Amino acid sequence: MAAPILRSFSWGRWSGTLNLSVLLPLGLRKAHSGAQGLLAAQKARGLFKDFFPETGTKIELPELFDRGTASFPQTIYCGFDPTADSLHVGHLLALLGLFHLQRAGHNVIALVGGATARLGDPSGRTKEREALETERVRANARALRLGLEALAANHQQLFTDGRSWGSFTVLDNSAWYQKQHLVDFLAAVGGHFRMGTLLSRQSVQLRLKSPEGMSLAEFFYQVLQAYDFYYLFQRYGCRVQLGGSDQLGNIMSGYEFINKLTGEDVFGITVPLITSTTGAKLGKSAGNAVWLNRDKTSPFELYQFFVRQPDDSVERYLKLFTFLPLPEIDHIMQLHVKEPERRGPQKRLAAEVTKLVHGREGLDSAKRCTQALYHSSIDALEVMSDQELKELFKEAPFSEFFLDPGTSVLDTCRKANAIPDGPRGYRMITEGGVSINHQQVTNPESVLIVGQHILKNGLSLLKIGKRNFYIIKWLQL
């Protein structure tokens, strides 16, 4: 069947599992052991976990990536389903995999699953996803496309290495499904899939044995992902799919479909799944997502997520989440042994990831917020924007007041509803329970001073007790 004409953009998915006996562990592949090889380099970083299928990957796949062969450059894709309006940290390794391939000169495609998201990928799930309305999926797909393009732009602008890179393209699979008729599609595609094979996937078996079972829509997901791979193979010459290690079943379906139709071999590369300290996969469904959209997770929160990583994880994460050369990572870890209290590896990890996700400005913002919150820095506070303060103190009430002559500390606290009326509120100040811009105030009648109580950005940060913050924006100073 000839693939229909492409019109739009796309974003990927990760899917089912397969019998691990058909996988060739990277450590056993002599062809991947060359110190300068792309696959060997990513194996050393721990970014590429497994290759599929075993047949041909000892020699053929490494040759595909060799700059000295006629097959160079290759096209590789990874899919992302728009089940939310933002990427999250759980998607970063797949994106880092695409970026490393792009840096090596290959062309990469980020495929937004504007069509497949409506079915829901069952891989790694114990129950069916909540169905999304069509307009919600479309809005999410637009947001993911913008997020992917922003990340690609930051990568291009801030992490250049002097090499000639390949292209980064964002597509959406709704472009080739929106004109498909169900009966025509099943007639052309369905005959190439065997029910026994589809039912044998581990992800399918787990769901079929569960009390909730599996819907036809979810079951059909692997067929559509296989067709995506075929379409990109026909249209772009894409021979490699990248995905999380829970996507092996879907990758296998694509391999079998393309091989039956064309006789050609295609390949899959998996990246490891990142889990929380409890072992849960990081993602929206697990309820522990750290988002890459500033409106959902601020640069400061993203930065702190990586700063808080334990010592036993940070070296691995530096290899996975950054482009730092391995010798430099070794040096960072050696310094850490001498001065562990400085948390140098964690800070470098946080800086590299935040810069990739939010750009240099986002990294600067995260550092300002860190200084303001954890180091009581007045200098950091007075250059923070309204947005940064709101991000940093998400639960803090935000008020805007005109500064009247003679406005006192007591007046300010009461206008902001930060203290109770009457003697109790007065005592909270005199007993040292109130600070303004990290400076304790004990005289309720003190008149506010611009430059001390009011920063040069027109803001005052009230702190009542240990953890109750109030933000005041002064107008027409």
Curated annotation (Swiss-Prot):
Segment annotated as transit peptide: 1-16
Subcellular location: Mitochondrion matrix
Keywords (A to Z) from UniProt: Acetylation, Aminoacyl-tRNA synthetase, ATP-binding, Disease variant, Ligase, Mitochondrion, Nucleotide-binding, Primary mitochondrial disease, Protein biosynthesis, Transit peptide
Motif 'HIGH' region in this chain: 82-91
GO molecular function term, any single one: protein homodimerization activity
GO BP terms, alphabetized: mitochondrial tyrosyl-tRNA aminoacylation; translation; tRNA aminoacylation
Residues holding ATP: D81, G244, S245, D246, I274, K284
Domain of life: Eukaryota
Record-listed L-tyrosine binding positions: Y77, D121, Y221, Q225, D228, Q247
Main location: mitochondrion
Catalytic activity line of the entry: tRNA(Tyr) + L-tyrosine + ATP = L-tyrosyl-tRNA(Tyr) + AMP + diphosphate + H(+)
Main EC class the enzyme belongs to: ligase
InterPro entries given in the database record: aa-tRNA-synth_I_CS, aa-tRNA-synth_Ic, Rossmann-like_a/b/a_fold, S4_RNA-bd_sf, Tyr-tRNA-ligase, Tyr-tRNA-ligase_bac-type
SUPFAM superfamilies: Alpha-L RNA-binding motif, Nucleotidylyl transferase
Sequence intervals crossing the membrane: none
A single cellular component GO annotation: mitochondrion
Enzyme Commission (EC) number: 6.1.1.1
'KMSKS' region (motif): residue ranges: 281-285
Known partners and oligomeric status: Homodimer.
Disease note: Myopathy with lactic acidosis and sideroblastic anemia 2: A rare oxidative phosphorylation disorder specific to skeletal muscle and bone marrow. Affected individuals manifest sideroblastic anemia, progressive lethargy, muscle weakness, and exercise intolerance associated with persistent lactic acidemia.
Protein name: Tyrosine--tRNA ligase, mitochondrial
Species per Swiss-Prot/TrEMBL record: Homo sapiens (Human)
Record lineage: Eukaryota, Metazoa, Chordata, Craniata, Vertebrata
